[in-house]
Amino acid sequence: MSLKEDVLKLKKEKNAIILAHYYVDGAVQDVADFVGDSYALAKKAKNTDADIIVFAGVKFMGESAKMLNPDKKVLMPDLNADCPMAHMASKAVIKKMKEEYEDLAVVCYINSTAELKTMADICVTSSNALKIVRSLPNKNIFFIPDGNLGAYVKKQVPEKNIILNDGYCITHKRVTLKDVEKAREEHPNVPIIVHPECVNEVVEATDFAGSTSELIQYTVDNPSKEFVIGTELGVLHEMQLKSPNKTFYPLTDKLICMNMKKVSLEKVYDCLLNETNEVFVDEEVKAMAEKSLDRMLELAK
């Protein structure tokens, strides 16, 4: 049997579900029960009746799955697959902001540690951030940890006073305005679409910005036969599956998340076979952090 067949057989035997993010290797996406962005994966983790969740993604995703469904065994193919941005906010700064602004809502991007989520009023993902921020009664919003997604939300929701944090995605930050200009020259009249984790000047210079699921849907719905893609290149796997007759060009070959790429099919098999790399979240942290996740799922409906 092939490794893929071994994984599928094992998954059935153990009543396990494999959840994979669009940024992991295509071979891993192919064995997953569900492939999605952070929001869709969080919903699936919350509602699954499987005994074991194998989360093919980075650490904060496994933590979120455990908090949303604490009775399940959550395994990760590689516990060292971490997201640097998830740590890029300071509890001290959050406390200071809360003291400074009376009606402050701390809005925490789901790409954050469980510890940071304990300080948040609500979590958001890139696909529901606009909807949720608009719906909050608070005028003042401290958006953590990603300053670039925060800037994108701030521009779209001018009626709120959105205070930005200085965190960033190390992968999306590599994209420059020069990359966009070069793509315009090489592929004239081809839509350039990017993730709002890119810096603001890049987002402004392109044709569409959205979450990974929104970018995929854009390439399905748009009549163009070609697209320039400005997000982690793992997403091309799903785009090509959904639109096999369309052509996709990477905005830059620098758009590779080394942490997502640590998740291999071999590691998926090993962690499921031996039930290793289980995710645990401190009970006190879980009790505080899960409120912000549950509130997100409620408000994003």
Over which residues does each language-model region extend?
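Active-site loop-to-helix "anion-binding N-cap" substructures in soluble metabolic enzymes
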Residues: 1-229, 235-301
